[in-house]
């Protein structure tokens, strides 16, 4: 969602990018507009002319124009539209949308434009690229669309496809922070990427960048070391995404998706509960992971590691954990949204579990009561 005022809007309006199920007729998603927050009207053609598009990923207001990008396609990968294009309109009420970029910024391996944000008078866009790693592009949106875009970071910040996707973008203290991830929770089986934990980089207005959280490595700009001293995933292998970042009361927050809670259900054989990890050409990693899980036990992994991580920093380099166990609920696998308000800092969790959950017993899988299932909203206030 975003607040935007176009030429035909008498005042700022709320614009929303919803999700349209293919089961409801398959007409494609539409951008919605609301003046009062109660009534919403469509202001875009279904799927921008593509009935297979069920939703849009980002919705950004920049220089009096509204930008968005489709993120999926019915019958295809969860994050692969028919064309990875940024769309723009100068007046949403006139229902006139045009391509603001060439498909994939000229790279067919850019499967989607995953996130966008405004920083330093430019629009930044981050992609999902399972072959070479994410790319970050920027434009000043001058002239007529499609606009001229400039690459800022390529090849997953020289980590390759282990930085498959830009998942989160947040402006903080005159710099742009990028959180990475691998689709499907840190392990992309379709493209055989990962498993691997996520990183954070920091981009400056002059397009130079720092590695904040991640793996040290050589780059075309010299060797990069994580300025926080923390490895990928804040040192937690299970943190497959930096899913959301936000600012509140002078602090930068980063929330993760932690897939450790899914271990008992991931590629498990009900007979011996061994885990056959597909590690994208890294058989030694898969074997080591299997041995680790077997020695510790998947239930103990969930007990001590289950639940998202939330970290905060006042300078973007020194980080402190707020929680590493989903606020005590292992079924809170991810931080899905953050909102700073005068009343405090709101956080919404991703918790896909229901009122019952499957538990392994000597007799096999059994469903038991699970009062911790379902999404939660938390409010943080200064003490």
Model-derived features with residue positions:
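Short, well-ordered, aromatic-rich surface patches in folded extracellular/luminal domains
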Residues: 351
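Trp- and S/T/G-rich repeat-edge/linker motifs of beta-rich repeat architectures
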Residues: 3, 9, 13, 22-55, ...
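Conserved beta-propeller blade signature
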Residues: 13-17, 65-69, 122-126, 175-179, ...
